[in-house]
């Protein structure tokens, strides 16, 4: 613990009132990555033992934690993290990297318009099992479904691509989502995996709902992604959040953890962008009843809403002064299984701020 960083800031997630809490974070280690250019993205493996870095030098770095007992046996005061691999293949800047929910797969994307899928091997190596060139412009973001091996990517070409593995063939793009009129910067799945949020240069956030194959039949629409052992689905644009931002929305993130409060049946969504705002949205699903009224959804498994109601739970203007806010992330789920109340943000001012 060689340095202390004090990060100030805070707004109440239900009222939006600043509480000026102070959080003290200890800088544990600085990792000299060896990357020759900017490190654009980092991702933890689900077990926290592997760290992946995506760089503008077109490579992905892989780092493993050296167990404390091994370091103690060796009497080493060396680094806690050690590079065990570099993934090469991209022809240009790597923009994003992400692990699958079980850590078996890793995805990377870049300015070369490609998405790469890597698989962890028994010898701790990673093997490329798919190169997907479906976008017509550079790819900004890749994320994995929270419960399945479904991959999504967002691009400068204004689209979102969804990919699955066909056991009889290879990884392929099974559907393209189009609703945005400009670059799609960020994606985030809901904890239940039935909804997807996308944010864009067009100052909107779209909420997409996963429609099952059976429901597709009822609605008279075609399901996508039908493979052996998989019935497929359709991702349908369900709600557009607009009018809250005055510039591109660079980041959107769904709070992990299930909510038992009907008002938060879809949980909390945080977004930030070029106008310096950070906004927390509460998403509520309501159903038409036989009496012509509406009732709240009661659980995350009720995935067929008649309407979605969005409430601004908190908003911070000029969160990083007068500069862009590039990224916002919720803290991991609390130890008691409840959704987190802490948010980290990164801005063009070079600061990381913590909000609660």
UniProtKB/Swiss-Prot annotation:
Signal peptide: none annotated. Gene3D superfamilies: YVTN repeat-like/Quinoprotein amine dehydrogenase (2.130.10.10). It holds the Pfam family WD40. WD repeats lie at residues 34-73, 89-128, 134-173, 179-218, 244-291, 319-356. One of its GO terms (biological process) is iron-sulfur cluster assembly. It comes from Malassezia globosa (strain ATCC MYA-4612 / CBS 7966) (Dandruff-associated fungus). This is Probable cytosolic iron-sulfur protein assembly protein 1. Keywords: Repeat, WD repeat. It comes from the Eukaryota. InterPro entries: CIAO1/Cia1 (IPR028608), WD40/YVTN_repeat-like_dom_sf (IPR015943), WD40_repeat_dom_sf (IPR036322), WD40_rpt (IPR001680). Essential component of the cytosolic iron-sulfur (Fe/S) protein assembly machinery. Required for the maturation of extramitochondrial Fe/S proteins. Belongs to the WD repeat CIA1 family. SMART domains: WD40. The keyword Repeat applies. One of its GO terms (cellular component) is cytosolic [4Fe-4S] assembly targeting complex.
């Amino acid at each position: 613990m060689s340095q202390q960083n004090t990060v100030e800031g805070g707004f109440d997630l239900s009222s939006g009132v600043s509480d000026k809490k102070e959080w003290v974070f200890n800088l544990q280690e600085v990792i000299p990555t060896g990357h020759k250019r900017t490190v654009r993205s980092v991702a933890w493996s689900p077990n926290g033992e592997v760290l992946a870095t995506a760089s503008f030098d077109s490579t992905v770095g892989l780092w493993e934690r050296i167990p404390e007992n091994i370091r103690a046996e060796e009497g080493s005061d060396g680094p806690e993290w050690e590079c065990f691999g570099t993934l090469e293949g991209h022809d240009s800047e790597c923009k994003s990297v992400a692990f699958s929910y079980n850590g078996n797969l890793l995805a990377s994307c870049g300015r070369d318009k490609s998405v790469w899928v890597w698989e962890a091997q028994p010898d701790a190596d990673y093997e490329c099992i798919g190169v997907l060139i479906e976008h017509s412009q550079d790819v900004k973001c890749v994320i994995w479904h929270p419960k399945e091996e479904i991959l999504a990517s967002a691009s400068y070409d204004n689209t979102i691509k969804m990919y699955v593995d066909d056991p009889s063939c290879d990884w392929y793009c099974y559907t393209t989502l189009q609703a945005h009129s400009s670059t799609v910067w960020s994606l985030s799945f809901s904890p239940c995996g039935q909804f997807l949020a996308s944010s864009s240069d067009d100052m909107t956030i779209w909420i997409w709902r996963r429609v099952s194959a059976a429901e597709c039949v009822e609605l008279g629409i075609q399901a996508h992604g039908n493979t052996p052992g998989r019935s497929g689905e359709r991702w349908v644009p369900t709600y557009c959040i607009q009018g809250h931002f005055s510039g591109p929305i660079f980041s959107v993130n769904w709070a992990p953890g299930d909510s038992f409060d009907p008002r938060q049946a879809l949980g909390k969504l945080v977004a930030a962008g070029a106008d310096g705002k950070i906004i927390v949205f509460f998403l509520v699903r309501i159903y038409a009843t036989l009496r012509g009224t509406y009732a709240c959804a009661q659980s995350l498994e009720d995935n067929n809403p008649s309407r979605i109601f969005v409430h601004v739970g908190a908003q911070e203007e000029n969160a990083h002064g007068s500069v862009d806010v590039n990224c916002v992330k919720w803290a991991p789920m609390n130890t008691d299984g409840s959704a987190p109340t802490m948010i980290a943000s990164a801005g063009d001012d070079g600061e990381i701020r913590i909000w609660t």
